[in-house]
């Protein structure tokens, strides 16, 4: 390798080291992702910006457009795809029809200047990591014992204007497949955060993020 090539390689490594990070919060349904996400965004010391994903599913009680997700229609999804700005997408056949979740390069992501946090899945993590680079995209994987998780999901569903227990059961079973140990290993996720106790879990996640950023 010549001197110029070596200098360029070193320069690329330095630029990568000083680029921002995108932390992707993952876990099965009712594992506490939304609560953890909201808390981390409000820790000023971490300075995380929100990366809001898109979905075509209906809003749930208490959700706001632009906070949990950008709630859009099928036409918006197709527009992103046709313009080549679709980073990743997932489609789920639910009891209420087809629901899409996707990440789009909408001009609001600047890893040169900011660190971000988003909520996703193993599938979206792999595609976002491929798009932005392995060094820039880091997983935050939450775990909760299945019985506790189901209890939380039932309580949350009861608060909805029109509870949909059939969809709750579908999500619960789908999570067992989507977040199986084989897929977790394939995604190279080695650090997990137990969310049985919220305070302890938050302390562990904050400590990890600080170790990465500082």
Q: What are the functions of these language-model segments?
A:
Residues 2-11:
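N-terminal pre-Walker A segment at the start of P-loop NTPase domains
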Residues 25:
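Hydrophobic anchor at the beta1->P-loop junction of P-loop NTPases
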Residues 28:
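P-loop (Walker A) phosphate-binding loop of NTP-binding proteins
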Residues 31:
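ATP-binding Walker
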Residues 34:
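Walker A/P-loop
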Residues 55-116, 120-122:
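ATP-dependent small-molecule kinase phosphotransfer cores
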Residues 115-121, 133-155:
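Conserved phosphate-donor/acceptor-positioning beta-strand/loop module used by diverse small-molecule
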Residues 158-208:
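Small-molecule kinase domains that catalyze NTP-dependent phosphoryl transfer to phosphate-bearing small molecules
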């Amino acid at each position: 390798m010549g001197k110029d090539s070596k200098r360029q390689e070193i320069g690329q490594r330095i630029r990568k080291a000083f680029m921002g990070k995108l932390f992707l919060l993952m876990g099965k349904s009712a594992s506490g992702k939304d609560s953890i996400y909201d808390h981390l965004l409000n820790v000023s010391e971490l300075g995380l910006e929100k990366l809001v994903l898109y979905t075509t599913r209906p809003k749930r009680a208490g959700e706001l457009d632009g906070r949990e997700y950008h709630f859009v229609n099928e036409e918006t999804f197709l527009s992103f795809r046709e313009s080549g700005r679709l980073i990743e997408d997932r489609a789920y056949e639910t009891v209420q029809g087809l629901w899409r979740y996707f990440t789009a390069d909408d001009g609001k992501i600047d890893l040169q200047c900011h660190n971000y946090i988003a909520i996703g899945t193993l599938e979206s993590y792999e595609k976002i990591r491929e798009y932005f680079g392995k060094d820039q995209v880091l997983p935050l994987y939450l775990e909760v014992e299945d019985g506790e998780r189901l209890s939380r999901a039932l309580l949350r569903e009861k608060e909805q204007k029109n509870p949909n227990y059939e969809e709750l059961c579908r999500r619960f079973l789908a999570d067992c497949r989507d977040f199986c140990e084989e897929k977790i290993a394939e995604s190279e996720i080695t650090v997990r955060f137990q969310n049985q106790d919220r305070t302890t879990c938050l302390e562990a996640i904050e400590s990890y993020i600080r170790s990465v950023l500082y």
